[in-house]
């Protein structure tokens, strides 16, 4: 219920506070995100290491499309909501095929880098709203479906839709709860 939502929000607030300390040094939020992407700073060590190696390894680089955080562009007003909605999936490694994912997994294992989560474009299926659910997104205070509020190359549509196609971004928790009640609690909500 609401307590659980509060716990999630508190955890996210703690992460944001850390992020904002970096921002308070006069950097724009966008620059921090860009630096995070470029250095893969704030990423799991396994992801950071394999992406660093991919920069100098043609076979590895050709197997990896990128990490989710690099493949999406988020308007500033929705950054916190999208970060919250995606959580660790921001670090999922997108590959063209299952074979590419297997190759990268093998490289992670060989290099003792640990684990990572993969989204092979050949396998991943989009998640969408039904008509009834889509109708509630027109409620005042609902900004829309998360995957429709961000930009990305069309070839990543299924992956982005899989992660965000059933998440709606709302102005506040109360609106989210009210909307979700109307569709039987089937949607993910982010503020």
Segments (PLM) and residue ranges:
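Extended, EK/Q-rich alpha-helical coiled-coil segments that serve as long dimerization/scaffolding arms
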Residues: 1-41
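Hinge-like oligomerization/junction regions that interrupt long coiled-coil arms in large cytoskeletal
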Residues: 25-191
